[in-house]
C-alpha cells in the first residue's frame, strides 16, 4: 500500500539532534489495512504482560504529565472533534509497555500484542527536562497532517500527510483510543538502525482501543461532545466525552 511505504523506510528523516538531546522516533508501523472484528477486546493476559512487577518503570509524576499532555492535544484538535474520548491511564497497558521497554529492542512489539494495541515509541540520548520532551515530536506531526473532508470519505477516507510521518499524532488523537499506558527504561546498550546507543532513554506508549486504521479518520469532526458514545451519557469535559473515570491504575506503591 502507498500509505505504508510512505511511512516505513523514512528513518533518515526522523533524526533530531540538539545540544543536549539526541532523539529518534520509530515510524509507526502499527497502521493496518482492515479493522478486525471485536477490536474493543484486547486480551493482554498472556501477551508478554508480566503478572508481577518488581519495580515501576514510570513515576507518578511522569504518568500524570504524559496523560495530561495527551488530553491537551486531544482537546485542541482542529477541526473540533464530536466524539473525542477523554484519555485515562490503564495499568495493563503500562505493564505491557514495561515488558517491551525492558527488552531494549528498537521496533514495535511484541507482534502478537500489536493486533490489539496501538504503540508509539521514542528513544533519546542525553538530558531532557521533562518526559513531555520525549513525546513532543509526536504531536508536532500535526503540522503535516490534513484532516480529510467528509466529502472525500466515500466511504474510505484518504491519508493526507505531507511530511515524513503523521501516524504518531493520529494515534494520539484517535477518538476511541481512550486508554494509555507508558513505560520508560534506560537501556545500557540498544541497536538503533545499525548504530549502538548507550544509556539511551527508551519510551514505549501503548494505546487501546488501537487506532490508525487505514481508510478511517482519527475522529468525527463536529461540535465537541455532540457524537459521544452512549456509554458517556452525555457527559463532557474539556471538549471530550467524559465518564468521570480518571484512571484504573492500581494504588501507587
Curated annotation (Swiss-Prot):
<feature type="propeptide">
    <location>
        <begin position="24"/>
        <end position="56"/>
    </location>
</feature>
<feature type="glycosylation site" description="N-linked (GlcNAc...) asparagine">
    <location>
        <position position="28"/>
    </location>
</feature>
<dbReference type="GO" id="GO:0030414">
    <property type="term" value="F:peptidase inhibitor activity"/>
</dbReference>
<dbReference type="GO" id="GO:0005576">
    <property type="term" value="C:extracellular region"/>
</dbReference>
<keyword id="KW-0325">Glycoprotein</keyword>
<keyword id="KW-0732">Signal</keyword>
<dbReference type="InterPro" id="IPR035940">
    <property type="entry name" value="CAP_sf"/>
</dbReference>
<dbReference type="InterPro" id="IPR001283">
    <property type="entry name" value="CRISP-related"/>
</dbReference>
<feature type="domain" description="SCP">
    <location>
        <begin position="67"/>
        <end position="207"/>
    </location>
</feature>
<dbReference type="InterPro" id="IPR014044">
    <property type="entry name" value="CAP_dom"/>
</dbReference>
<dbReference type="InterPro" id="IPR047899">
    <property type="entry name" value="R3HDML_CAP"/>
</dbReference>
<comment type="similarity">
    <text>Belongs to the CRISP family.</text>
</comment>
<protein>
    <recommendedName>
        <fullName>Peptidase inhibitor R3HDML</fullName>
    </recommendedName>
</protein>
<feature type="glycosylation site" description="N-linked (GlcNAc...) asparagine">
    <location>
        <position position="120"/>
    </location>
</feature>
<feature type="signal peptide">
    <location>
        <begin position="1"/>
        <end position="23"/>
    </location>
</feature>
<keyword id="KW-0646">Protease inhibitor</keyword>
<keyword id="KW-0964">Secreted</keyword>
<comment type="function">
    <text>Putative serine protease inhibitor.</text>
</comment>
<dbReference type="Pfam" id="PF00188">
    <property type="entry name" value="CAP"/>
</dbReference>
